[in-house]
């Protein structure tokens, strides 16, 4: 039977205490590429969470039958299969968003968070805990993505979900959109500020020299 304390730890821990982006600095590439809009950040969060959760579940389910010499290949095959399913669903039901995300959905297979949880946790833990660990890490990744996407879209174009929130000067409003926020380097600075803020609140996360 699943340990409720362990499930709570693996589900909530990655949100703040062990965030895969803020603490482990994983999954940075997609965090830069898909956060120009809040909508794409949310969809990418859902996609990564589903792939991480179900890949961890299936890998945990067969962990005792995977030879150590080919475990990485098996893990990648399972992850790749799930990524293809997610990509096909997006193309079928959310084609415009799928086009905006471009190759980055397919590149979920190379996301260190997905592979890392499969190797570090799913290969050593029961299926239910592994599934919840996948959800927790996917949501931890998503929290940063959504925050970055929120700030970049709001200050870069004055919109959220494509809806004008702050009317631009060109349209008779007061806000002058800052195009810098729509460039990839801005995501680096925002993520850096989020990491700084989190480690200020939680000094234990600061690396010791």
From Swiss-Prot:
The chain crosses the membrane at residues 42-62, 72-92, 103-123, 131-151, 178-198. Disulfide bonds: none annotated. It catalyses: a ubiquinone + n Na(+)(in) + NADH + H(+) = a ubiquinol + n Na(+)(out) + NAD(+). It is a multi-pass membrane protein. One of its GO terms (cellular component) is plasma membrane. It is an enzyme of class 7 (translocase). It is found in: Cell inner membrane. Keywords: Cell inner membrane, Cell membrane, Ion transport, Membrane, NAD, Sodium, Sodium transport, Translocase, Transmembrane, Transmembrane helix, Transport, Ubiquinone. It comes from the Bacteria. GO terms for molecular function: oxidoreductase activity, acting on NAD(P)H, quinone or similar compound as acceptor. It holds the Pfam family Rnf-Nqr. Its EC number is 7.2.1.1. The keyword tRNA processing does not apply. GO terms for biological process: sodium ion transport. Belongs to the NqrDE/RnfAE family. Composed of six subunits; NqrA, NqrB, NqrC, NqrD, NqrE and NqrF. NQR complex catalyzes the reduction of ubiquinone-1 to ubiquinol by two successive reactions, coupled with the transport of Na(+) ions from the cytoplasm to the periplasm. NqrA to NqrE are probably involved in the second step, the conversion of ubisemiquinone to ubiquinol. This is Na(+)-translocating NADH-quinone reductase subunit D. The lineage of its organism: Bacteria, Pseudomonadati, Pseudomonadota, Gammaproteobacteria, Enterobacterales. The gene is nqrD.
